[in-house]
């Protein structure tokens, strides 16, 4: 498989000290090694991860793609040295892949005549490329075309990827800003359900409004916990050599929201039936009572008014004032 031949990375003296301290059961031990802030009990927080997934924090989504590409190029010797990307696409993929020593190959993703995915081209690329190729797949809100796969298309894409032995490399930059938090990662979860190896790059810049905090994550899904441990050790080396560790503040904000039911509900709370009625009565904006809106109803001429109206209703409820401008 793709990652089974990955070996452990070279040891770092700081982590040797940490490993020795962690294995010492003497209650009087004092850890003066790794520079992490701890409480009076000597405890520090580490995010839980599933055993077969090697997860590391990265410097936003760009950092996740960079570290993921470096890992494939340096350590995953069973992965071919080229990556397939549908075009038009995000302009930073090519320099990131080139920097890692990987070649970017392209196929057509978008039909400008219809504004939809060129699905025949996508399937042709998957079916004709060498077995074991890597495909960068944007999970939702395709940049720059906004042409996403439907669920039915995802079913076919994932089945074809599995059949032809390819590695999915997901770029998840807009989760929750497309169809919904769960819907936007349908392709990722489908691969997980099939037990496929994959790389998943996550950004929390846009969906959490944390651009300046550069918060992201890289997940490498492996075939076993032993493989995942070796993969994570290689990721540790890459991060240590390049920027040592990621900033904690943004990650703590994300963790706070996702671990607090009330905070998460506030982030995901849709427009209520009453708020939709208020939009209609006060602002002549019409939406179905469940709060879903059709983006195609917005234009350059009305988007500012609509945004101000929705903001007024959400902030002020039934006392919303008519937006200006």
Curated annotation (Swiss-Prot):
One Pfam family, short name? Aminotran_1_2
User: Is Lipid metabolism found in the keyword set?
Assistant: no
Under which EC number(s) is this enzyme classified? 2.6.1.-
Instruction: List GO molecular-function terms, semicolon-separated.
Output: L-aspartate:2-oxoglutarate aminotransferase activity; pyridoxal phosphate binding
Look up the record and name the pathway of this protein: Secondary metabolite biosynthesis
What superkingdom does the record give?
Eukaryota
Query: Where does this protein hold substrate?
Result: 35, 143
Record-linked Gene3D superfamilies:
Aspartate Aminotransferase, domain 1 (3.90.1150.10), Type I PLP-dependent aspartate aminotransferase-like (Major domain) (3.40.640.10)
Sorted UniProt keywords: Aminotransferase, Pyridoxal phosphate, Transferase
Task: Name the Gene Ontology biological process terms.
Answer: amino acid metabolic process; biosynthetic process
User: What interactions and quaternary structure are annotated?
Assistant: Homodimer.
Role description: Aminotransferase; part of the gene cluster that mediates the biosynthesis of the tetramic acids Sch210971 and Sch210972, potential anti-HIV fungal natural product that contain a decalin core. The PKS module of tasS together with the enoylreductase tasC catalyze the formation of the polyketide unit which is then conjugated to 4-hydroxyl-4-methyl glutamate (HMG) by the condensation domain of the tasS NRPS module.
Its family remark reads: Belongs to the class-I pyridoxal-phosphate-dependent aminotransferase family.
Which PANTHER family does the UniProt entry name for this protein?
Answer: ASPARTATE AMINOTRANSFERASE, GLUTAMATE OXALOACETATE TRANSAMINASE 1, ISOFORM B
Q: What is this protein called?
A: Aminotransferase tasG
This protein's encoding gene: tasG
């Amino acid at each position: 498989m793709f990652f089974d031949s990955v070996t452990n990375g070279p040891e770092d003296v700081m982590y040797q000290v940490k490993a020795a301290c962690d294995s010492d059961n003497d209650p009087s031990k004092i850890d003066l090694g790794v520079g992490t802030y701890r409480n009076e009990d000597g405890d520090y927080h580490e995010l839980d991860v599933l055993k077969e997934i090697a997860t590391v924090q990265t410097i936003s989504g760009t950092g996740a793609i960079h570290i993921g590409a470096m890992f494939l190029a340096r350590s995953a010797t069973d992965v071919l040295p080229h990556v397939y990307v549908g075009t038009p696409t995000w302009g930073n993929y090519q320099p990131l892949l080139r920097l890692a020593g990987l070649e970017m190959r392209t196929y057509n993703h978008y039909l400008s005549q219809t504004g939809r995915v060129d699905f025949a081209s996508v399937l042709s690329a998957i079916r004709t490329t060498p077995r074991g190729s890597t495909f960068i797949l944007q999970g939702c809100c395709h940049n720059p075309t906004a042409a996403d796969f439907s669920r039915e298309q995802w079913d076919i894409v994932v089945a074809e990827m599995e059949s032809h032995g390819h590695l999915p490399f997901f770029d998840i930059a807009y989760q929750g800003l497309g169809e919904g938090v769960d819907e936007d990662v349908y392709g990722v979860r489908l691969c997980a359900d099939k037990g496929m190896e994959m790389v998943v790059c996550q950004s929390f810049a846009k969906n959490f409004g944390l651009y300046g905090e550069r918060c992201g994550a890289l997940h490498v899904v492996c075939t076993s916990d032993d493989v995942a441990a070796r993969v994570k050790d290689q990721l540790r080396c890459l991060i240590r050599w390049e920027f040592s560790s990621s900033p904690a503040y943004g990650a703590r904000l994300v963790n706070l929201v996702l671990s607090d039911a009330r905070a998460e509900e506030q982030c995901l709370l849709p427009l209520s039936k009453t708020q939709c009625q208020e939009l209609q009565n006060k602002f002549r904006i019409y939406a179905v009572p469940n709060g879903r809106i059709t983006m195609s109803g917005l234009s350059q001429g009305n988007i500012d008014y609509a945004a101000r109206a929705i903001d007024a209703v959400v902030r002020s409820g039934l006392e919303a004032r008519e937006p200006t401008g």
